[in-house]
Amino acid sequence: MLGKEEEFTCKQKQCLSHFVTNLTSDVFALKNLPEVVKGALFSKYSRSVLGLRALLLKEFLSNEEDGDVCDEAYDFETDVQKAADFYQRVLDNFGDDSVGELGGAHLAMENVSILAAKVLEDARIGGSPLEKSTRYVYFDQKVRGEYLYYRDPILMTSAFKDMFLGTCDFLFDTYSALIPQVRAYFEKLYPKDSKTPASAYATSLRAKVLDCIRGLLPAATLTNLGFFGNGRFWQNLIHKLQGHNLAELRRLGDESLTELMKVIPSFVSRAEPHHHHHQAMMQYRRALKEQLKGLAEQATFSEEMSSSPSVQLVYGDPDGIYKVAAGFLFPYSNRSLTDLIDYCKKMPHEDLVQILESSVSARENRRHKSPRGLECVEFGFDILADFGAYRDLQRHRTLTQERQLLSTHHGYNFPVELLDTPMEKSYREAMERANETYNEIVQEFPEEAQYMVPMAYNIRWFFHVNARALQWICELRSQPQGHQNYRTIATGLVREVVKFNPMYELFFKFVDYSDIDLGRLNQEMRKEPTT
């Protein structure tokens, strides 16, 4: 290969071997380096003629006085400070925010309400969250005699304390009591056959039970989350949390900053309260919210608000299908996008179909993604569905989602499997009690009242999404192992798009419209070892 060959002394090679995965290839990874050093190193890399190994030696591994290099027990304390000074200079003085993406950290957040978890997971770019699942883990445990739900300090010092605690306990009591009842009911309804492994049957049955009763869990229910994020992600998230109206989220912002300052201080220092960037950001967020909230409250409507669960296409592009076809052709053409769109508009219908079909004909499963040209069209949807389904769909990040406050105003989703069974009465009693308590609290504490709302209650939110991201979401979330509620939303999204223009159906060939009883059974059976 042509390129500048780097030559290192034996001692330099010995030193470098502790910090890079190889000494000769053009492709190598870094190891055993602090995050701030790795980030500063890559940032300097973009403005240097040196290779990364030589730059690492020059900037961080060589003694500035005599040029000697490190040994295996090298102490990075000086280099960490040097890198930190570099970050302060670049971030603060030049505002080059992208260098904050060159290092990151893992952060665990435990005993967080599922209401707060959604705010944390709203942060889309640069971070990856994982959350304890309400579909596979029972939430009936007690610690020191108390169920695991968040006790908001404002509610705990208000006149609603006893009402809130009593209703949450009632919801958890109902949830716990229904577990064995629903399990026994499903064991009779879906008996295990001789060919089904016991462990696969037990896992799929448990998922079915939890799918039915998770709607009883209030938004105050405690969960655990794990995040990996780059420095820019953490800084933006902390800014958001520190300015939130809920005390829980402000506390999480402060505690996250404290812990991240121990591992990636240079990446998050601008979120410290005394920093001028932080003060300006807080003022901006506060003013923005106050202005938009005031304008929204002035809006009046003559029609009654619909509270029926629905998926509604609000807007789409009538010329979108031509833009998609042009987008498919563009990488293989030398003409402008405008020329190609005009070309596709004027061609015979069968020729347009041929272009569209050629982009999907080779797809053998949902992981075979369509070309990026499918991103040339976007849709907007208004969705009203249960909070549990929202929690599952909200984790998709290649789209725009906004939600309204969680409330009991739009009714709740009752699991159809429990209709006309002995369990229906206790489930509905719990829902009604939660509704009554919410209506009392919301008059004085509209945001804190959300903690009271069970997951079965409906919430309104919108999707603004390109067709390629929609393809991924709908083909994934319609699979048999998914929860029936979000499967219904996924198929509803596709139906709305196909109604808008039937030609889009080509791109959703792996959407599963089937009704499945024990949805996870086939997947669990695939996990069983063959004999």
Swiss-Prot record:
Keywords: Repeat. GO terms for molecular function: flavin adenine dinucleotide binding; NADPH binding; thymidylate synthase (FAD) activity; thymidylate synthase activity. InterPro entries: Thymidylate_synthase_ThyX, Thymidylate_synthase_ThyX_sf. Residues 38-274, 309-511 form the ThyX domain. One of its GO terms (biological process) is dTMP biosynthetic process. SUPFAM superfamilies: Thymidylate synthase-complementing protein Thy1. Pfam families: Thy1 (PF02511). Belongs to the UPF0159 family. This is UPF0159 protein CPn_0746/CP_1126/CPj0746/CpB0774. It comes from Chlamydia pneumoniae.
